[in-house]
Amino acid sequence: MSKSDFWILSVPSRGGSNADLCDDIERLLVSGSTSLISTVAPFDVPPFKVESLDVLISQSEQLTKQDAQCASAISKISDIIKNTVSSSSGDLKDYFMVQDKSPLEYVSSFAWNSSRFHMNKTISEISDRITSEIISFENDIRTRQTSFQQASSAFQNMQKKQSGNLSQKSLANIVHEEDVVHGSDYLTNVFIAVPLNLEKQFLNSYETLTDLVIPRSAKKLDQDSEFVLYTVVVFKKTADSFITKAREAKYTIREFTFEQGLRETEQSEFDDAAVKEKRMLSSLLRYASIAFSESFQGWIHLKCLCVYVESILRYGLPPDFSSVIFQPMAKSEVKIKNILLSKYAYLAQNPVGNNKVKNVDSSAGLDESMADLNLDEEYLPFVLFTVPSKVFNY
């Protein structure tokens, strides 16, 4: 799935409602069979506790930082889901559900969850809680991802030991009791994986690689498409020298000590590693789905706070604004913005909130305070926030 960002627009109500603004946006951006947007819906913003202008400005700055933090955290959660699901051949959309809805369905029917985010709290208290929860979800899923990666790495190593070539795979299923020297104080076995193209050279030279190599002791144990496995009997006191010379000759030494029951032990370890990897994967994906859903909900609630604070700073008190959320069609963003700028140009010429803010510092007017904010690099006469779709694209 690849979609454009969601846009949340807030403008003065002038006696209208969110539904009326939806109708306005549809008239503006949908013309006959040509539509610049794929969906538009009311974005209901409840009334929050409003403090002084100084506090609102501080909250605006803090919300901007928290919005960026939350977007980054959710994007990382999303990346973990996509990377993990791709390796498990799952259906991505199942992990990007929000309260059993797609992100589009959730934002299009957004309603403030007052049982989760209590309205008797201040804006800062609510935003702090949302941010803390989302960052906690990110940290938790990173920890679970690390645990899964460790389990997966352990299982892959086990697989390599069972299915690799003779220079890598376990020898427990290859070496038998009759292939090794038992109970000798002087003799030991050295196991060597010899490249196929060097086998003749090895057989002609192994007895002279070092002193005290038992003549004609080389025994072929197995062969694959790349290597042939031999065991050679040498005296223990020259084993290290023999190993060094063998490596210099481009042979691969296999460190192995025969033990009764080793084959069964390794098979049990392999089975345990497979079960653990599967369990950790299931746990990671289950938690990732929860983490995305809960974090996305929190993020949209944070966007709601952003809309409220910026609308009051822009349009004044008491709160009297309407807001909608819509999704531009691909490559139509510039055209939509120009249409909105034309439609709401009067807001730049005659700011609504100049004389409506009450209980603020009388030494600083709203215009001066807003000038200090530098909220956006590009000034817009209306309040506009985006919900970047990259965090839930799949």
Curated annotation (Swiss-Prot):
It is a peripheral membrane protein. Its main location: cytoplasm. CDD domains: V-ATPase_C (cd14785). It is found in: Cytoplasm; Vacuole membrane. The modification Phosphoserine is found at residue 17. GO terms for molecular function: ATP hydrolysis activity; proton-transporting ATPase activity, rotational mechanism. Belongs to the V-ATPase C subunit family. This is V-type proton ATPase subunit C. It comes from Schizosaccharomyces pombe (strain 972 / ATCC 24843). The gene is vma5.
